[in-house]
């Protein structure tokens, strides 16, 4: 498995990432380890160290499912992570239960990370 920075450019130790990844809890396309969040991609795994995270929250998007006129919206839960650099990352979760759990764990592991959505100031774009 190849580990790469999810965003930005910083050195990674493949062996320590692999050890943390194998102990991490799978929550969908996101895993939470002791030191980082891991985002699954087709041919690689993105690493996002918790010390780069400023805020985390859940987002629910309605995704149309079905064919033709029988399309109905289905809610998909995402973990949204805003970084200190201003960038944002999004990873799909299995459901609300995993989302609530990961937010509690992130806060327990790194109390300086803000939890919950904060509306942007007037005139600013939402992440």
Describe these PLM feature segments.
Residues 2-3, 55-127:
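Acidic, Ser/Thr- and proline-rich intrinsically disordered linker/docking segments
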Residues 1-34:
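Anionic N-terminal interaction surfaces
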């Amino acid at each position: 498995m190849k580990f790469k920075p999810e965003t930005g450019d910083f050195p990674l130790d493949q062996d320590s990432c692999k050890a943390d990844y194998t102990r991490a809890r799978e929550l969908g396309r996101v895993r939470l380890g002791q030191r980082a969040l891991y985002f699954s991609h087709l041919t690689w795994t993105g690493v996002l160290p918790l010390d780069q995270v400023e805020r985390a929250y859940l987002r629910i998007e309605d995704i149309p499912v079905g064919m033709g006129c029988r399309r109905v919206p289905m809610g998909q839960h995402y973990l949204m992570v805003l970084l200190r650099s201003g960038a944002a990352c999004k990873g799909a979760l299995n459901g609300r239960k995993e989302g609530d759990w990961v937010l509690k764990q992130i806060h327990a592991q790194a109390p300086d990370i803000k939890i919950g959505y904060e509306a942007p100031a007037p005139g600013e774009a939402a992440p």
